[in-house]
Amino acid sequence: MKQQRQLRRREADETAELPADLPPLLRRLYASRGVRSARELERSVKGMLPWQQLSGIDNAVEILYNAFREGTRIIVVGDFDADGATSTALSVLGMRALGCDNISYLVPNRFEDGYGLSPEVVDQAKARGAQLIVTVDNGISSHAGVAHAKTLGIPVIVTDHHLPGDTLPDAEAIINPNLRDCEFPSKSLAGVGVAFYLMLALRTFLRDKGWFDERNIAPPNLAELLDLVALGTVADVVPLDANNRILTWQGLSRIRAGKCRPGIKALLEISNRDPQQLAASDLGFALGPRLNAAGRLDDMSVGVALLLCDNLGEARVLASELDALNQTRKEIEQGMQAEALILCEKLERSSETLPGGLAMYHPEWHQGVVGILASRIKERFHRPVIAFAPAGDGTLKGSGRSIQGLHMRDALERLDTLYPDLMIKFGGHAMAAGLSLEEHKFEQFQQRFGELVTEWLDPALLQGEVISDGPLSAAEMSMEVAQLLRDAGPWGQMFPEPLFDGRFRLLQQRLVGERHLKVMVEPVGGGPLLDGIAFNIDTTCWPDNGVREVELAYKLDINEFRGNRSLQIIIDDIWPL
């Protein structure tokens, strides 16, 4: 039932003016990813966009400066995902380093509080003595929460990156690159990126006011926070535009050099990752899921505590706790995915084809895992998916994932305009969104969402594609080129890791684990023998000893085991010939 994907090759921008000394392969890869000048390849901090272009930031730093001087109790209110956890930890660490002692944090519980700065969360902050609230990775849609804080006499600074609605909360300051009047060129900052920029601006303001001289302290080196910026940016799957690549590269470089938080070191250890060989993908696929597991199944305060702690021994205990939660999350997800596939089969049988947009619900699904489920089903069937779980009060909480061609938040906004009583609330981005609705309205939502996707989305976009960077020559299938590609990143969302295609003789094939296909192949036109592995293969099709030749979509990789390094390929797709 899994959709067969079609191969398409990228086209390079022939007008790109890239450095003449770049290797031809890198010129091709960069040009096909929209890089047009050497400036976009800058990875040093001097290439970062200036904080001065973020609207609202001047007002925010002045409020914070006054709070610092007066000893105001500041509560940072975060979010329960990896971006929210890193944003929270960065803000607390940053303000402490800048000289603020009266600061704490609060992370809403996914199951008890829901998302964002709600009135109930404001009451919790008030109970902890809040005199100023700073939101990180949330707040842009928290109208009621901000209004409630105002009635309690608590000013609010909102820092967020989610798309704003037609109206903004009545906060004392709002920093969000996606505000309509914000001139900051990068609209892809993660929440942790926005928080980092606020710390940069605050340090400058404090220096100009003589804050550090008065206290006879040196201004802190905020680059020490870039490990958190890299982790949150990659884990939140925001596009790695030029500015985010700088932030991520700088953070990766610090982690590789061992200059990172004990909590990140502990996450690296528990996930068996060598810091010196760390890639951006490791942040997204190894560290991020473990950190996210706290917010999905338990309480993200555990994750924030891990990132804040200064003791490696304590960090190892917390990382082990997160690892156990992540294993539980995987088990829950596997069961939910099996149930989702049964629902898809029923939908397919009832209408002979799957709807263009899938909305699915099961009364036993876990609301902390529906986002991952939606992502998995989207990948399998290449169409927008929203998965729902019961919230326990007669309502459902849904998490959506989209494909190129359908802006998920805009689609929900259109549904809200057409059917104002259908949803309770919604929010998000182009590729991901969250929402809630009354349980008895699910079937109506399922129908309306499917109709809207059918109306909005070109059917051709429902055909899954593998987008390749073309073939490699035999000479390019080498350790040197694999290392060149590893060093040419960071690769990530909207700046994908190089993927190549070619025809190979299939010399050996066997299953390892339960669902991974280990192969040895040789290029049809001649070249080196290559070990390869395809993860999560369809075991109803593979291994197939009757297949002698295959077309592969693959990544060059360096396999490191017990101190030995060897070339291998990671297979994304395999087609028998």
Swiss-Prot record:
Native source organism of the sequence: Salmonella typhimurium (strain LT2 / SGSC1412 / ATCC 700720)
GO MF annotation: an example: single-stranded DNA 5'-3' DNA exonuclease activity
A Pfam family the protein falls into: DHH
Record protein name field: Single-stranded-DNA-specific exonuclease RecJ
InterPro entries per record: DDH_dom, DHH_sf, DHHA1_dom, RecJ, RecJ_OB, SSDNA_exonuclease_RecJ
GO BP terms: DNA recombination; DNA repair
Keyword vocabulary terms for this entry: Exonuclease, Hydrolase, Nuclease
Stated family: Belongs to the RecJ family.
EC number per UniProt: 3.1.-.-
Biological function: Single-stranded-DNA-specific exonuclease. Required for many types of recombinational events, although the stringency of the requirement for RecJ appears to vary with the type of recombinational event monitored and the other recombination gene products which are available.
